[in-house]
């Protein structure tokens, strides 16, 4: 097992068991990889594919994780990694005439979206951590708190479509 170190500038969202072919989801994922968050949202809203909506929800969820958990600004987020993996296959039987049945295989996929904050420089963060760990340095970590008040009935216009 390879251990990967978690990056403090990255947040992710993982969607599993999405009823869609991985090949069809990769078509959309290849278009948004490496783009900014705002540009990605515009592209996904205007693309005519069925795979766009689950990916749009995942990107939106990853950005919400970034702003709520880490205090990142949505303008500074870039999709650093987006991957689609094959999931389990849902197997069903379709009844046919004269007591026969045909198998139906529905492919599923799992999608991982990783957003990276471009405003934070790694060297600044290391210097900040160094001053915290020094004796006589900062006693407590400064935590970014956002005191904006959101209008929860008017803010989420994305979820109206099905």
UniProtKB/Swiss-Prot annotation:
This protein binds specifically to 23S rRNA. The globular domain of the protein is located near the polypeptide exit tunnel on the outside of the subunit, while an extended beta-hairpin is found that lines the wall of the exit tunnel in the center of the 70S ribosome. This is Large ribosomal subunit protein uL22c. It is found in: Plastid, Chloroplast. The keyword Ribosomal protein applies. Keywords: Chloroplast, Plastid, Ribonucleoprotein, Ribosomal protein, RNA-binding, rRNA-binding. NCBIfam families: rplV_bact. GO terms for cellular component: chloroplast; large ribosomal subunit. Part of the 50S ribosomal subunit. PANTHER family: CHLOROPLAST 50S RIBOSOMAL PROTEIN L22-RELATED, LARGE RIBOSOMAL SUBUNIT PROTEIN UL22M. Belongs to the universal ribosomal protein uL22 family. GO terms for molecular function: rRNA binding; structural constituent of ribosome. One of its GO terms (biological process) is translation. CDD domains: Ribosomal_L22. It holds the Pfam family Ribosomal_L22.
């Amino acid at each position: 097992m390879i251990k990967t170190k978690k990056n403090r500038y990255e947040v992710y969202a993982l969607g599993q068991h999405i009823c869609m072919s991985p090949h069809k989801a990769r078509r959309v994922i290849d278009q948004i990889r490496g783009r900014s968050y705002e540009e990605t949202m515009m592209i996904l809203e205007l693309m005519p594919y069925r795979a766009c909506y689950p990916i749009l929800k995942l990107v939106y969820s990853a950005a919400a994780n970034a702003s709520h958990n880490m205090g990142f600004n949505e303008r500074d987020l870039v999709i650093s990694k987006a991957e689609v993996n094959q999931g389990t296959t849902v197997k069903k039987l379709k009844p046919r005439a004269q007591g026969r049945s045909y198998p139906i295989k529905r492919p599923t996929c799992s999608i991982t979206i990783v957003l990276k904050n471009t405003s934070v420089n790694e060297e600044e963060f290391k210097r900040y951590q160094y001053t915290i760990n020094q004796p006589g340095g900062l006693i407590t970590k400064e935590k970014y708190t956002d005191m904006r008040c959101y209008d929860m009935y008017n803010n989420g216009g994305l979820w109206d479509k099905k």
